[in-house]
C-alpha cells in the first residue's frame, strides 16, 4: 500500500520507532509497517502527528494477536519507569549476570548428562549458592537477628561464670570416655598421645607469663575445636574422603606448574629436582593466591574462618583473622590483613599474631612439601587444626591482661592481571629466600656434622652428628606425641632439623624415610633404621607443619617491625616466646592426630 495517513499522535520522544519499523494495530491484528519519507507536524509542544507518504504494510493475520502488542507496551512502560536505573547499570554487573547464568546452564547440563560425574561440581555450586544467600540474609537482617538473640546472649553472660566450667568438664569427660572405649579396640597408643597433650598444656601453664590470669575459654575451646576437626577429618568416612579428595585435587592442580618449568628449563628439568621442580610450584601457587585475593575469595574465606574462631573461642577479631589467614598465607603476609590495627593491639594479641604464624605453614610452600612425597591430605589437615591450637597455646602462654580496643574493616583494589603479575613477582623473593636458606643451612649442617664427627672421634664415637644430638633432646617430646618408641629417635632428629634450621630440611629428610618404606627392603642397615611405621610418619607430618624455627624468628621480627615500628620493643620481647608457643601448638596438633588416628598397633 502506498498511502499517506497519520500513523501516530503523541509526544515525539515516545514515538514507537525501532529500526525503521512502526508497530501499529488494524482491527484485531498486528501491522508491521516499514516506512520511507517520514514527515511530522508539530501541533503543540506536546503532540506530534507523524505522516508517511510511502508506507509498506505487512499484515501478519492471526500469527501475532493483540496480546503481543500489550506485552510490547508493558516492556516500554517498564523501561520508561526504570530508565534511570537501566541507564546507570554497570557493564560488569551485566557480565557477572550473564556469566552466572551461563555457569548454571553448564552445571545443569553436566548434571543431566551424568550426575555422578558432575557431583563435585554440583556440591561446589550448592555450597556457593548457600553461602551467597547466607551473606545476603545476614547483611539484610543483621539487626533483627541480633535483637532476636540478644536476650539469650545477656542470659549467657550472666551465667557464664559457672557455665564455662560445666562445659569444660563435659568436654573433658567426653574425651576421656571416648578414649576409654576407643583404646580397648585399638591399643594404648592413643592414651600416650592424649597424655602428651595434657603434658604440653601443663608445661605452658607452668611457664605462662601470667599463670593466675589465664582465660580458660580460648584454651579449652581451641583444644575442643582440634578434637572436633580431628574426629571429623580422620575418623569419619565423609570427612576423610572429602579431605583426601581435596588433597588429590590440590596435588593435581599444582602439577600444572610442570608445564611452565618444562618450557623454561627443558625436558630434563627434573634432573635438578629442587630448583626446577619444587620452586616453580611456589611461583605458581603464589600467583594463584594473589588472584584469589583479587577476586575477593580469600578475604571471604579467611573472614568466615576467623568469625567461627572468634565466636567459638572468644578471641578478639584481630587475632582470629590472622590465625585464619595463616592457614592459607605465610607468617609475614597474614599480619597485612590487619595492618592498620597492629599499632593499637595489646601485647597478648601481638603474641597471638606471631604464634599463629609460627604454628602453620603458607599455602605457597604446601605444594613444595607435597612434591617431596608427603601426604597432601595430612598437610592440609595439619594447617587447619593448628589454627585454633595456636590461639589456645598463645592465650595460655601469654594471657590477656589489657582491654582490646580494635574492630575491623577491610578493602583491597587491583585488577586480575595485575594481581597475577604481582603474585608471580612477589614469589621471586620467596623463592630466592628458600633457595639461599637451603643452600646455606645444608652447608652449615655439613660443617657441623664434620666438626662433631671429629670431636666424637676423639672419644671413639665418630657417628656423633647434629641430628643425633637433636634426636636425644627431642626424643621424649616425639614419644609423648604417640610416635613408636623405636621411631622416636628419628622423629627427634627431624624436630631438631625443623627447629634449628627449617621445615624444608626436615620434610626432605622425612620424604627419604617415606620412600625407603615404600621401596621395602631391610629396616636396619649397619644398625641404623632406614624407615618408620606409617603412624610415626603421619604424626611427624603434623609435628613438622609449622614455621617455628630460628630462621623464621628473624624474619618475623623484621617483617612486623616494618609494619608497626611503634611496637618494635614488644615484638622483640615476645618473639622468642611466640616461637616456643608455635612449636608447642604443632606438637599439640600431632598429639590430637595421634589420639584420633585410625592406625592400630603395628
Language-model features: locations:
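Alpha-helical membrane segments and immediately flanking helix-loop junctions
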Residues: 310-366, 370, 416, 491-592
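Membrane-lumen (extracellular) interface motif
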Residues: 90-98, 104-126, 160-163, 175-195, ...
Amino acid at each position: 500500500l502506498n498511502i499517506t495517513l497519520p500513523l501516530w499522535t503523541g509526544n515525539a520522544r515516545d514515538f514507537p520507532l525501532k529500526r525503521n519499523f512502526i508497530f501499529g494495530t488494524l482491527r484485531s491484528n498486528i501491522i508491521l509497517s516499514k516506512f520511507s519519507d517520514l514527515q511530522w507536524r508539530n501541533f503543540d509542544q506536546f503532540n506530534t502527528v507523524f505522516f508517511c507518504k510511502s508506507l509498506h504494510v505487512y499484515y501478519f493475520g492471526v500469527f501475532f494477536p493483540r496480546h503481543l502488542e500489550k506485552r510490547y507496551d508493558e516492556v516500554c512502560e517498564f523501561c520508561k519507569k526504570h530508565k534511570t536505573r537501566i541507564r546507570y547499570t554497570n557493564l560488569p554487573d551485566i557480565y557477572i549476570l550473564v556469566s552466572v547464568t551461563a555457569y548454571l546452564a553448564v552445571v545443569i547440563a553436566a548434571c543431566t548428562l551424568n550426575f555422578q560425574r558432575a557431583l563435585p561440581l554440583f556440591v561446589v555450586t550448592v555450597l556457593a549458592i548457600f553461602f551467597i544467600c547466607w551473606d545476603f540474609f545476614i547483611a539484610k537482617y543483621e539487626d533483627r537477628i541480633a535483637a532476636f538473640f540478644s536476650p539469650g546472649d545477656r542470659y549467657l553472660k550472666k551465667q557464664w561464670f559457672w557455665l564455662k566450667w560445666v562445659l569444660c568438664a563435659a568436654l573433658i569427660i567426653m574425651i576421656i570416655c571416648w578414649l576409654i572405649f576407643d583404646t580397648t579396640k585399638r591399643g594404648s597408643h592413643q592414651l600416650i598421645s592424649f597424655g602428651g597433650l595434657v603434658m604440653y598444656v601443663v608445661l605452658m601453664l607452668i611457664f605462662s607469663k601470667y599463670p593466675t590470669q589465664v582465660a580458660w575459654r580460648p584454651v579449652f575451646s581451641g583444644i575442643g575445636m582440634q578434637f572436633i576437626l580431628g574426629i571429623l577429618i580422620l575418623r569419619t568416612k565423609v570427612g576423610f574422603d572429602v579431605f583426601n579428595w581435596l588433597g588429590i585435587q590440590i596435588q593435581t592442580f599444582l602439577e600444572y606448574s610442570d608445564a611452565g618449568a618444562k618450557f623454561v628449563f627443558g625436558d630434563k628439568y627434573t634432573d635438578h629436582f629442587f630448583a626446577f621442580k619444587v620452586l616453580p610450584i611456589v611461583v605458581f601457587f603464589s600467583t594463584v593466591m594473589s588472584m584469589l585475593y583479587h577476586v575477593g575469595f580469600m578475604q571471604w574465606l579467611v573472614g568466615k574462618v576467623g568469625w567461627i574462631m572468634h565466636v567459638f573461642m572468644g578471641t578478639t577479631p584481630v587475632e582470629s583473622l590472622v590465625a585464619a589467614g595463616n592457614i592459607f598465607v605465610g607468617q609475614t603476609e597474614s599480619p597485612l590483613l590487619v595492618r592498620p590495627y597492629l599499632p593499637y593491639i595489646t601485647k597478648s594479641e601481638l603474641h597471638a599474631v606471631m604464634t599463629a604464624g609460627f604454628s602453620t605453614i603458607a599455602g605457597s610452600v604446601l605444594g613444595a612439601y607435597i612434591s617431596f612425597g608427603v601426604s597432601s591430605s595430612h598437610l592440609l589437615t595439619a594447617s587447619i587444626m593448628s589454627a585454633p591450637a595456636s590461639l589456645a597455646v598463645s592465650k595460655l602462654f601469654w594471657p590477656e591482661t589489657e582491654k582490646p580496643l580494635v574492630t575491623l574493616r577491610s578493602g583491597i583494589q587491583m585488577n586480575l592481571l595485575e594481581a597475577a603479575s604481582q603474585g608471580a613477582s612477589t614469589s621471586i623473593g620467596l623463592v630466592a629466600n628458600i633457595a639461599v636458606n637451603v643452600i646455606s643451612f645444608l652447608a652449615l649442617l655439613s660443617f657441623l656434622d664434620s666438626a662433631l664427627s671429629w670431636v666424637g672421634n676423639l672419644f671413639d664415637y665418630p657417628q656423633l652428628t647434629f641430628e643425633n644430638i637433636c634426636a636425644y633432646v627431642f626424643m621424649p617430646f616425639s614419644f609423648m606425641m604417640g610416635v613408636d618408641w623405636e621411631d622416636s629417635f628419628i622423629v627427634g632428629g627431624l624436630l631438631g632439623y625443623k627447629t634449628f634450621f627449617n621445615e624444608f630440611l626436615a620434610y626432605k629428610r622425612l620424604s627419604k624415610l617415606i620412600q625407603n618404606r615404600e621401596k621395602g627392603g631391610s629396616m636396619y642397615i649397619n644398625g641404623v633404621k632406614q624407615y618408620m611405621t606409617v603412624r610415626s610418619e603421619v604424626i611427624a607430618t603434623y609435628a613438622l607443619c609449622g614455621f617455628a624455627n630460628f630462621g623464621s624468628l628473624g624474619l618475623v621480627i623484621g617483617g612486623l617491625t616494618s609494619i608497626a615500628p611503634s611496637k618494635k620493643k614488644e615484638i622483640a620481647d615476645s618473639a622468642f616466646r611466640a616461637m616456643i608457643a608455635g612449636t608447642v601448638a604443632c606438637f599439640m596438633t600431632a598429639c590430637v592426630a595421634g589420639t584420633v588416628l585410625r592406625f592400630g598397633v603395628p
